[in-house]
Amino acid sequence: MPKSSNFLDIDDLTTDELQTILDRATALKHGGDNAQFPGQTLGMLFEKPSTRTRISFETGMTQLGGHAIFLGPDDIQLGHGEPLSDTARVLSGYVDVVMARLFNHDDLLEIAAHADIPVINGLTDDAHPCQTLADLLTIKEEFGGFDDVTVVWIGDGNNVGQSFVIGAAMVGLDLTVVTPSGYGMDQSVLDQATALGHPPTIADTPGAAVSDADVVYTDVWISMGQEDQRNEKLTAFEGYQVNESLLANNSAQVMHCLPAHRGEEITDEVLTGTRTLVWDQAENRLHAQKGLLVELLSEN
């Protein structure tokens, strides 16, 4: 049973629960019992737009026998005109589970504090745990598990990276984080990984870090809402691009959560090349989130 009925970051699950969700996702992907929740409804709150998050959750809930309702910025004014606490209470009377993709993580916490139904973090500025589920499912499929798998994160210490650091520690991945000075993960995230017994190695030189990597993972340098930092970040991240030269002397597979800024953090040749896991990773958002929905709805 989950430590809470919500999924606000990856550590809302125990390690055993995380493994159970990944196993269930694999079973569902390969033809397991899908239509488990007829008549149930997922409410999807989108303050930030997304292709993968909306389609994967809406498709997943439909495949599980339920229904999903999309509420975008024009449909619901989060925190404007009506307190978030009231919105959460009202939604609790209409739907069975809420997925929220927001800017401010505190807004997500406010919704979760006043909802009587499970709340899922579809992304905030601080965390993206649904992406971590898909990432871990992809690695498990590719390597048969997590033992002796070495992953190198190259780029910004953003929300995707922070959830991945914690998820990697939970399953025991050998992780190295390579970021420019001033753009690393929050210290609280690194401390949490240390408490879990698997802190990442911190480095600032991509070339040396990837020599023994099984997976090289990158993400955009300029996240949504950071457009005014573009020139500053392009300068700071020079030399951190995942390209054919960086990968020339190793056999690492490549991951990226998408959308990619081709020619910035990754080249087109690498993104679409023979060593990419990116498209499996994108598909696995669907299956991992179905595994999560089954976990939450079965308990509630």
From Swiss-Prot:
Pathway: Amino-acid degradation; L-arginine degradation via ADI pathway; carbamoyl phosphate from L-arginine: step 2/2
Record: residues binding L-ornithine: N159, D219, S223, M224
Chief location of this protein within or outside the cell: cytoplasm
One GO MF term attached to the UniProt entry: ornithine carbamoyltransferase activity
Sites where the protein binds carbamoyl phosphate: S50, T51, R52, T53, Q77, R101, H128, P129, C130, Q131, C257, L258, R285
Oxidoreductase listed as a keyword: no
GO cellular component, one term: cytoplasm
Xref: InterPro entries: Asp/Orn_carbamoyltranf_P-bd, Asp/Orn_carbamoylTrfase, Asp/Orn_carbamoylTrfase_sf, Asp_carbamoyltransf_Asp/Orn-bd, Orn/put_carbamltrans, OTCase_ArgI
GO biological process entries: arginine biosynthetic process via ornithine; arginine catabolic process to ornithine; citrulline biosynthetic process; L-arginine biosynthetic process
Residues annotated as signal peptide: none
Keywords: Arginine metabolism, Cytoplasm, Transferase
Pfam families with a match to the protein in the record: OTCace (PF00185), OTCace_N (PF02729)
Record's catalysed reaction(s): carbamoyl phosphate + L-ornithine = L-citrulline + phosphate + H(+)
Compartments, record wording: Cytoplasm
Domain of life of the organism encoding this protein: Archaea
EC number, as in UniProt: 2.1.3.3
Role played: Reversibly catalyzes the transfer of the carbamoyl group from carbamoyl phosphate (CP) to the N(epsilon) atom of ornithine (ORN) to produce L-citrulline.
Family the UniProt entry places it in: Belongs to the aspartate/ornithine carbamoyltransferase superfamily. OTCase family.
Protein name: Ornithine carbamoyltransferase
